[in-house]
Amino acid sequence: MEALGDLEGPRAPGGDDPAGSAGETPGWLSREQVFVLISAASVNLGSMMCYSILGPFFPKEAEKKGASNTIIGMIFGCFALFELLASLVFGNYLVHIGAKFMFVAGMFVSGGVTILFGVLDRVPDGPVFIAMCFLVRVMDAVSFAAAMTASSSILAKAFPNNVATVLGSLETFSGLGLILGPPVGGFLYQSFGYEVPFIVLGCVVLLMVPLNMYILPNYESDPGEHSFWKLIALPKVGLIAFVINSLSSCFGFLDPTLSLFVLEKFNLPAGYVGLVFLGMALSYAISSPLFGLLSDKRPPLRKWLLVFGNLITAGCYMLLGPVPILHIKSQLWLLVLILVVSGLSAGMSIIPTFPEILSCAHENGFEEGLSTLGLVSGLFSAMWSIGAFMGPTLGGFLYEKIGFEWAAAIQGLWALISGLAMGLFYLLEYSRRKRSKSQNILSTEEERTTLLPNET
């Protein structure tokens, strides 16, 4: 792939050089970089399959066990809440714990608890089932946070000059996980029952653990002086965090609601419901590498990708139902088309956020090493988790009260507000820089005039 062919060797800025950079061929991937890509691809694929497998059939099973739509939304949402808390801790202590250990341990626990989720159908109905669902999801959330925080940091360390390209390319595997999870889960559920999808997927993730223990390189760094709170206090970082939050909530909103809406509206079997999820995930997976390459090759484009991606996402969610005031009839082909466009707009907005935060951190005095990468990774995961908690929780509640059409429109307002806020910030930033540049030119002209000899 051309994007990866141009990547430079793992030469970290600030003299914090990753191992294995010696003896590598300029302009091509070193052995360690290839291993890092394989490890990150495996965790992206496995983790997103574990996350998305519930969508087509779990809401229906949970209803049989006595859970309401609101409770189902909270079961989906609690994953993100505890991922938020764990991401902040793991991001702050990444250097102390060790990136490789955090990565491998996260995958191991994630595979184990995925298998545990498969035996929950044997738990008694009602409060006991609901409590066990929450417990297993919390354990999965902590392991997911560990693996993903470590993965992002290791990638940014190995590819310091092409962060967006690499992250965007690897989002293909995240998208592939989102693509494969629902249809594979729906098919296995329809063919073999509730337990088999979780046991199969959990075993696949566990098989990836020894591979990553062997091939993933160790990266060491000294602890940094800056904190998470200093990073989030930067205005630009705070607004980008809001963008991440809004987009994550849009993804999360669909987990407890879309399958129920499709089953009710179009009477599709569970296996076909998984295929509806395919449109958004596939377009996101395909577009992410392109937007990553654009973000690295043309950094000024990042701001416009962020803004317009949010605005397009907002429009998509208005049309997802569609919202009744538009008087457009709900049709399956229209729903799939809107999900495809929404996947494209999500990739447009999400991919530039990590390099934008990292760039802003470096501009404001954060050191260029693994410590800052851990903070940025933790912040990204934490903000994503807030949205992924609020999206399903609020989505399940609104679906129950006002129906899918209006609930989706309200969800779209979140993306609209974040897009407009980000656009306003960039306009103010441009105006401020232009005014500062004009003042500097004027000051330079005045100094030059005073230095010229007076004419007699």
From Swiss-Prot:
Signal peptide: none annotated. It catalyses: spermine(in) + n H(+)(out) = spermine(out) + n H(+)(in); spermidine(in) + n H(+)(out) = spermidine(out) + n H(+)(in); serotonin(in) + n H(+)(out) = serotonin(out) + n H(+)(in). It is found in: Cytoplasmic vesicle, Secretory vesicle membrane; Cytoplasmic vesicle, Secretory vesicle, Synaptic vesicle membrane. Residues 1-24 are annotated as: Disordered. One of its GO terms (cellular component) is secretory granule membrane. The modification N-acetylmethionine is found at residue 1. Residues 55-70, 122-127, 185-195, 252-272, 326-331, 399-407 are extracellular. GO terms for molecular function: monoamine:proton antiporter activity; polyamine:proton antiporter activity; transmembrane transporter activity. Residues 10-23 have a biased composition (Low complexity). Expressed in various tissues including lung, placenta, adrenal gland, liver, testis, and brain. Coiled coil: none annotated. The modification Phosphoserine is found at residues 21, 438. It comes from the Eukaryota. Belongs to the major facilitator superfamily. This is MFS-type transporter SLC18B1. It comes from Homo sapiens (Human). The gene is SLC18B1.
